[in-house]
UniProtKB/Swiss-Prot annotation:
It comes from Gloeobacter violaceus (strain ATCC 29082 / PCC 7421). This is DNA-directed RNA polymerase subunit beta'. InterPro entries: DNA-dir_RpoC2_beta_pp (IPR012756), DNA-dir_RpoC_beta_prime (IPR045867), RNA_pol_Rpb1_3 (IPR007066), RNA_pol_Rpb1_3_sf (IPR042102), RNA_pol_Rpb1_4 (IPR007083), RNA_pol_Rpb1_5 (IPR007081), Rpb1_funnel_sf (IPR038120). Transmembrane segments: none annotated. The keyword Transferase applies. GO terms for biological process: DNA-templated transcription. Belongs to the RNA polymerase beta' chain family. RpoC2 subfamily. Its EC number is 2.7.7.6.
Amino acid sequence: MTQEPQPKFINRKIDKKGLGKLISWAFSHYGTARTALLADNLKNLGFRFATRGAVSISVEDLQVPDSKVNILETAEREIQRAEERFTRGEITEVERFQKVIDTWAGATQELTEGVKENFQERNPLNSVGMMAFSGARGNLSQVRQLVGMRGLMANPQGEIIDLPIKANFREGLNVTEYIISSYGARKGLVDTALRTADSGYLTRRLVDVSQDVIVREEDCTTQRGIFLGSLRDGDKMIVSLEERLVGRVAGRDVVHPVTGEVLAPRNTQFDYDSAARIARSGVDAVMVRSPLTCEANRSVCRMCYGWSLAHSHLVDIGEAVGIIAAQSIGEPGTQLTMRTFHTGGVFTGEVAKPLKAPFDGKIKFSSALKARPMRTRHGDDAYQADQAGTMSLEGSDGKKETVTITPGSLLLVRDGQRIEAGTMYAELALVGKTARKSTEKAQKEVFSDLAGEIKFADLVPEVKTDRQGNETQYASRLGLLWVLSGEVYNLPPGAETSLERGGKVEQGGVIAETRLVTEHGGGVRLKEQDAKGGREVEIITASVMLDKAIVHEEKSQGREHYSLETDNGQVFALKVSPGTKVNNGQVVAERVDDRYMTKSGGLIKYSEGVEVAKARGKQGYEVLKGGTLLWIPEETHEVNKDISLLEVEDGQYVEAGVQVVKDIYCLTSGVVAIAQRNDILREVVIKPGELHLLDAPSDLKVAHESFAYPGTEVIPGVVTTDLRYVEQVETPEGLAVLLRPVEEFPVPDEPDAPSQEASQQAGSSIRLRGMQRIPYRDGDRVKAIDGIELLKTQLVLEITDQAAQLAADIEFVPDEKDPSMVRLQLVILETLLIRRDVAADLLHGSTLTHILVKDGERIGPGAIIARTEILAKQAGTVRGISRVGQTVRRILLVTQSDLVNVPVEGTLTVKPGDLLRAGDKLAKDFASPESGQVVLAESGRVVVRIGRPYLVSGGAILLVVDGDLIQRGDNLALLVFERAKTGDIIQGLPRVEELLEGRKPKEMCVLVERPGKVQITQMPDESYQVSVVEDDGGVTNYPIIGQSLVVVDGQQVQTGESITDGPSNPHDILRIFTAREGLQKGIESVQRYLVNEVQQVYRSQGVEIHDKHIEIIVRQMTSKVRVEDGGDTTFLPGELVELRQIEQVNEAMAVTGGAPADCTPVLLGITKASLNTDSFISAASFQETTRVLTEAAIEGKSDWLRGLKENVIIGRLIPAGTGFNAYEEAEEVIEDDELIDDTLGLRTVGVAFAGDDDFVEEEDED
């Protein structure tokens, strides 16, 4: 404890920050008990006065600053000006948008200042003000929304909506504002939900990787350490040296840079005072001890860790610093933003510092200042400084102010210009490694506000062809694209026009007409108009009717079934229903016929003379020539059960009704054949027939599996009486012959087809053809128990000739003589739709249709059915006809409403064809009221055709060509622009995760491998070739793909510096520095990079985390190396080993003269590191349990129970805090022979542990 200081008397207004400082001061000087008392007293004081003060919020407390009206008016004037410049074509769409966003951002900022001033100056005791400024509730940005304005919001895609919410919650929002406002609110909610999940998982991984880091030693006596300086981003201080030193231990003596006096000897602990003293002395960097360089075994020592931040003293032995580190990094995770808003334009506060004139005066540039003209992002003309120099502002009364201009700064004034106070005259570009502007390419569409014709004024289109051969038009430089107003008619496909350019059209006159033409011709059927006023015309190309057959309808199970009865009594089942379409070759009906039904499954054989062809679409075989089908019945049971359930033997003769397999009975008598595989019974076949035993195989006089005709002697004494199929079988009684019965089914050559009459249009014919199909081929075995149908007779639609691709419609037609009888008719229709007449709308004129045919008329192919005319909405002159190939697609009429008549006196300064902007002079005192093109200029009047100029920036993609006709809202061009990315694209949690998981960043920068001088060559296709001429004369080329450079030609670069923008890849840093400066340096540089990067993310969100927490995690990530070559050691190539372990083994090798192991450092992400820890219990409880345990079992691993997690899992006391000593004592009790030495000299405790519980009890007794 420091000597007791004098109590301080603090008498001032105190806010949240001040309160924190007060408590912290009390704590470090007076300890816990007295601080607690102080806090208690403060609480009572606070409550007492809060109760008396009765601070509450009423609507009256929400005071809107008076300056709001003026601020909004100014902003709206600026925006109005930008809109006017945009309409005149002086700035592009992007520049307008940027200007709007920046103006509103500025206004919001100014208003926030106004709110602050209003509360602090005019009304310091306002409840809302007191709450916000004291830090009790709310903050300035929330108060701004209550009494200032809500400001700009982003849409769900993250683009800023250029309509700000001007109202605040005190005034209330209107409907539009309310909806825009809800966008942002919803995003906030969704983000928070995602954040908590992400951050929880991050914490879990961190705890797992660091849970075994415990302070186990007093001092590891290492001479190494890390250099701490202040962490800055450009000119902005992120963490000061003083802040970083507190709670650290000096790694070597700290010496005053001027006097040489030792400010702090080695191993000094820095407290607030000594840290402040060192920072004041001007020391740039101090070497401190750090967990990163601690040489304690698998832990850290007290000196390297430094203070335990909980009580500002050196950390105690046995403290679980790993878990503390993990929680310190994980907990603020929720406060980090998930993703950056992708904000179209980013406020430039980040990358440029605006300079405003403090007084009126005249600008002077120094001679060194070199600047070139350029266009700002608001479309103003300005200069950009190429070389540094100074610029001074000289006031009339001798005042003078000089500023240093950095390269890349914007100068908004000219040399010698006079400016007024408050004018912004420059934007200084910040210099510094981290202040680099990273930009990305983005596109913005330009839509036309009016319909009309495109005219390129000074645009020079340039065509680029990519590798696929697609051509794209680009604007080669800044230029104007005009849209000259007119009425554009979109013509439907196939429309023809007789108009020519310059032709006149009256209102209601015909612009174009389309014709409806029949392709095949035939009989006409006119349908009634439908609800929408359209009509269908059907043309019957061909039809066929079954004139003698009657259609019967039956209903079953709620569905209709149709059958067809012919005059000779055959019945066909219809396979189609009325109103459906049938294609060529499709089956229309199938005969209902049981002559070809079998009683069971069996074998099918074709007799001589049957000829078949494969039918369409896997539908069996079509009979070409008739004959007889031979059918050998057999009964097949598919079983698929265990063989033990079989009740009969292979080859046994069974009677009908016998159980062959459990619960399966045969329906016929016959010989059993069994198919089995792997003791699974597949099927049981029963083959009926006469069974005769054979004495010798030679007795069989007929070939096996052939037919025996009636009267054939099969074996001596057996003669067949009818046709049989002969099979030789093995029975339990011996060899036998089975004579199987054969059924014969005759097949006619041609099936009966019902009579039909057809009406055909020349060239296409249609009929129904009878067809016989056999589903099986010769020799097929049909597995079935019930019967099957061997032959199907079908009616098939046949369409011949050119109409084969058409489909026929099914119709049921009442008979002419007897309407109660219904006949089947198939027709081929050509259906033509006649559109209803439409009134004119924005894109089309009105249409009028005439039908030119009558119902029932017969017409030839190519006849015109109807004609549709497109009529003009207004009278006008044809000015443009846009064609695609030969067909006209759009027609432009210029009507009276597109022209402006301007009476003018005096001499005209314009001639026909000139393009004017609104406000340009027509004659001396006469300005044009509209932008456009002069059509007529005669004495006394000028006629201007209204137009609208659009400024297109160089490099923009043009989507129209000169002379195109476009409708309103068509896309004219894509402006390509670069927008600044705020800091880094990935911010917040995802970035922390990316760093800690050691992932390669998406758009990573290119790093310099060896120091040297940069040479940049520009290629013809605008890309760069960067090479570094190294100090030893070697040259390395670096490929740059689509990234912007951050170095300039001739710049000297060091190892590991970045050439392009974007985040670095930590693996590259490790590789480059290891190759250049050795293992230790490589590991150190990547450790430094990771610690600083993680700190930057947290600091940018205003979260303070001490470096040492991040260092512990990074230490765990970099503690392993990969063995490349094991040398004479026991290590295997590719193995991941602790660096310490390899160093110790290599020291031993140096003594014995063996070859040392060779290794490269690896950076493991936290997940990988957790899974690679020595403790398999810890790794298995984290992820991939099965894999970890299986591998541990195969390798025969032991778990040394060093960490907390392993011990918790198996239910022992954890080796931290008071449990730490139990270990030390436990190890002393054990006899030497029970110790097993491990390579690291860490002792494992065998099972003969002197009972953990005893120690706990002994301690209790003390």
